[in-house]
Design a protein with these regions (language model features):
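Short helix-boundary/capping micro-motifs
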Residues: 86-87
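Short hydrophobic alpha-helical segments within the ABC transporter permease transmembrane module
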Residues: 97-108
Length: 186
């Protein structure tokens, strides 16, 4: 359902426009250019201090990871999701409303996909049909590296965060080294 929904959304977007659409909304651009400056940083060749910063997309993503981690670990909904992911038949026999929980999970999935698209647009300040093509496989591989089982029932958002960091580090190292073939990285 989720991949089919993605392909449907991508197709509908292609009907609207196949050109890149730059975002010119002032509030959106303020958000995109905002920085959370840190008290540390580096100096340039002239000795001028350049503070380190964190973009708002990283802050929002970290807040979402923490909220989802708490939801999955300490709330009934999260425990139901783990039970259904582990074994749907057992969850049904325990008296859990599997259909309702799955429906709620798809609602949460849709919200998080929309938020991810918003954060992606904050980074690029533009929208394009082919912009995030192939990132679904990056997301799946990062989750697996972080310890999530594709069969379900096992995995944490914090583990997935570490999977994203590990995959990003490996991709960056391969790109900057330039010693491996181009098919190793997108």
């Amino acid at each position: 359902v989720t991949l089919a929904g993605m392909f449907f959304g991508r197709g509908m977007t292609a009907i609207i426009s196949t050109d890149m659409i730059s975002i010119k909304n002032e509030l959106f651009l303020k958000w995109a250019n905002y920085r959370f400056y840190m008290p540390f940083g580096s100096t340039n060749k002239k000795g001028k201090f350049i503070p380190a910063y964190i973009p708002p997309t990283v802050v929002i993503a970290l807040i979402v990871v923490i909220i989802i981690a708490v939801l999955l670990k300490y709330r009934k909904f999260g425990r139901k999701l783990y039970a259904i992911g582990g074994n749907r038949q057992s969850a049904l026999m325990m008296g859990l409303n599997v259909k309702k929980t799955m429906f709620q999970a798809y609602i949460l999935d849709g919200f998080l996909a929309g938020l991810g698209g918003f954060l992606f647009c904050l980074n690029s300040c533009a929208g394009f049909v082919e912009q995030a093509k192939g990132l679904e496989m990056d997301a799946i591989s990062s989750a697996v590296i972080g310890g999530t089982l594709l069969s379900g029932g096992v995995g944490t958002p914090i583990g997935t965060l570490f999977g994203v960091l590990i995959k990003g580090t490996i991709s960056s190292l391969i790109t900057t080294q330039g010693t491996l073939s181009s098919w190793w990285v997108r």
